[in-house]
Amino acid sequence: MNVLSCSTNTLKGLYDISGVEVGQHFYWQIGGFQVHGQVLITSWVVIAILLGSASIAVRNPQTIPNDSQNFFEYVLEFIRDVSKTQIGEEYGPWVPFIGTMFLFIFVSNWSGALLPWKIIELPHGELAAPTNDINTTVALALLTSVAYFYAGLTKKGLSYFSKYIQPTPILLPINILEDFTKPLSLSFRLFGNILADELVVVVLVSLVPLVVPIPVMFLGLFTSGIQALIFATLAAAYIGESMEGHH
């Protein structure tokens, strides 16, 4: 009963976290729900960029690849390597999921540093990178949770749940709690780093408009890429762990 109560409280905590607000927001009413409109707008822009890049990548493939084809093949090979390293030999079906996670987060993070979101005026609030909103990061983390539960159940069936009593049944509450804290750690890490990076740049630009913020912006681009890689790597690692057993 205590375990069930802990799990319920953790899920309620995730729901409450999705209501955390930083700055002003532009709200839409969709089906009786209040959503952050600026997150949907910037997410659609990121998705459009990814779809446009994908259409370019598959258009007129050459036997001898040109520069753009080489670049996209390198990105695909990189994602496959990350998936294979973390998941193992059965990584193939998970490459699209891991790749989508990595590319969406990567482009979202970079859009916050490269695109002039602030010059676009809204009735209320302001535009920012999708990953600058905790609703986005919590949603990505919950998708990862669904993915590794699905991977474990597909591979092992109901015997997947036996991992919760390994190596001893005494650890049952801790093992259950661990699965519910994984989304929290993923979402907080990504949200905190991206928000902090954008806040530092905004403060420096307001204090010293020229020259000084440029190195910080380059550092932000680097850390944004690292955060996307960390998220995708951990997502793949969780999926691999659920398929192989408790480590």
UniProtKB/Swiss-Prot annotation:
Gene Ontology MF terms in the entry: proton-transporting ATP synthase activity, rotational mechanism
Membrane topology: Multi-pass membrane protein
GO cellular component, one term: plasma membrane
Keywords, ordered alphabetically: ATP synthesis, CF(0), Chloroplast, Hydrogen ion transport, Ion transport, Membrane, Plastid, Thylakoid, Transmembrane, Transmembrane helix, Transport
Entry-linked InterPro entries: ATP_syn_F0_a_bact/chloroplast (IPR045082), ATP_synth_F0_asu (IPR000568), ATP_synth_F0_asu_AS (IPR023011), F0_ATP_A_sf (IPR035908)
Signal peptide location: none
Subcellular location: Plastid, Chloroplast thylakoid membrane
Transmembrane segments: 38-58, 95-115, 134-154, 199-219, 220-240
Pfam families per UniProt: ATP-synt_A
Function per UniProt: Key component of the proton channel; it plays a direct role in the translocation of protons across the membrane.
PANTHER family attached to this UniProt entry: ATP SYNTHASE SUBUNIT A, CHLOROPLASTIC
Oligomeric and partner information: F-type ATPases have 2 components, CF(1) - the catalytic core - and CF(0) - the membrane proton channel. CF(1) has five subunits: alpha(3), beta(3), gamma(1), delta(1), epsilon(1). CF(0) has four main subunits: a, b, b' and c.
Family per record: Belongs to the ATPase A chain family.
Protein name listed in UniProt: ATP synthase subunit a, chloroplastic
Taxonomic source organism: Eucalyptus globulus subsp. globulus (Tasmanian blue gum)
Encoding gene per record: atpI
